Design a protein with these regions (language model features):
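Glycine-rich, small/acidic residue-mixed loop/short-helix segments
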Residues: 1, 71, 218, 223-240, ...
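Acidic, proline/glycine-enriched N-terminal capping motif
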Residues: 1-73, 79, 322
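Short amphipathic beta-strand starts and helix->beta connectors
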Residues: 12-21, 64-75, 103-108, 149-159, ...
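Acidic, low-complexity central loop/insert segments
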Residues: 24-27, 31-32, 77-208
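Short, surface-exposed ligand-recognition loops at beta-strand->loop->(often short) alpha-helix junctions
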Residues: 34-40, 122-128, 261-267
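Short, solvent-exposed amphipathic alpha-helical segments in soluble enzyme
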Residues: 47-53, 101-106, 136-137, 185-190, ...
Length: 330
């Protein structure tokens, strides 16, 4: 979630432009869990929804941690290193993920350890330029690939992030050094971005985050992230039976996350209606300087199609799968 994000003092429109046209930096409410031991990748491969065994040191992926009933416990970034696999997730999901791993360990030669870390996000088309100007000698190339780097005088783990709006990177820093890392990035052209601007960028990119747009009440097929978080070629893992059953039914679910063009600003939790009947609810709302009022939210399967007309708080709204293709007119 974005609980650590606050207003920066700058105008949200300026922050938005920085994230869309240049580079912006945010502090993310995430933490890490280290998994070590000789069978660490085998173990995680059997626990998470994506292919962990196929990753070499320096590579990574995103995955879902699920219950046996398919409930989403967390979105996890998996970073394979030479002697450890680092799992990055929301701070409030570290304990549930650790509990699930411990419960399924059953004698497997793996060990778990949490450690203090601050996680920063750097997004925008000039993010790479900022990093190089700040001292990073090279940038990770593949999505969720990573390596050690320096920003100014501070060591960081630098990750090419696939869960930020647009091109972006995530940096893992020691907590006592995080302010220095952030200040160095800002000194080399990154602008601080607060929640209001980031929400607009996330909604435009249809970039859902766990805790804000997704909870334990959701199934992976409802999030629009199945192709990102799931490998269809791997064997058994926790929650696999539910995924396979849904795939056998064509992936059909009763509700799914969609974008919405709104006729007026709204707030998260506001119901989506159609024909006087409830048809969903909003999860993230924003006023985009480019598009006006927009949102992400869940809609009933009868309104999955782009262009479906619904209402939010009695005001007409329209379902969107791609905001850029939908154009700038309401």
């Amino acid at each position: 979630m974005l609980r650590e994000l606050e207003t920066t003092g700058a105008a949200p429109d300026e922050e938005y432009r920085a994230g869309r046209e240049a580079a912006g930096v945010v502090t993310l409410g995430r933490g890490t869990l280290d998994v070590s031991g000789p069978k660490r990748q085998d173990f995680l491969h059997a626990m998470l929804s994506n292919d962990v065994n196929g990753r070499r040191p320096g590579e990574g992926c995103r995955a879902a941690s699920m219950s046996a009933k398919g409930s989403l416990l967390a979105f996890v970034r998996v970073l394979v290193d030479t002697s450890v696999v680092v799992l990055e997730t929301e701070k409030e999901r570290l304990e549930p993920v650790l509990h699930t791993l411990e419960r399924h360990k059953v004698g497997a030669p793996v060990r778990f350890a949490t450690r203090p870390v601050s996680v920063l996000g750097l997004l925008g088309p000039r993010a790479g330029e900022v990093l190089k100007a700040a001292g990073a000698s090279s940038l990770p190339e593949g999505m969720d690939s990573h390596h050690e780097a320096r920003v100014g005088e501070q060591p960081v783990r630098l990750v090419r992030a696939s869960d930020l709006p647009g091109d972006g990177f995530v940096l893992h820093a020691q907590p006592e050094q995080a302010d220095a890392v952030r200040q160095t990035l800002e000194a080399h052209g990154a602008a601080a971005i607060g929640r209001e601007a980031l929400d607009a960028l996330r909604v435009e990119a249809l970039c859902p985050w766990y805790g804000t747009d997704v909870t334990e009440d959701n199934l992976l097929h409802e999030t629009g992230l199945l192709n990102v978080l799931h490998s269809s070629s791997k064997g058994c893992y926790v929650g696999q039976e539910v995924i396979a059953r849904l795939e056998g039914r064509g992936g059909n679910v009763n509700k799914a996350l969609r974008g919405l063009r709104l006729g007026a600003p709204a707030t998260p939790g506001t119901p989506v209606t159609a024909g006087g009947k409830e048809a969903g609810w909003l999860t993230t709302c924003a006023v985009s300087p480019r598009l006006g009022p927009i949102a992400m939210g869940y809609v009933h399967r009868s309104h999955f199609a782009p262009g479906s007309e619904v209402e939010v708080a009695g005001v007409p709204a329209r379902v969107v799968l791609n905001f850029d293709e939908a154009g700038t007119s309401a």
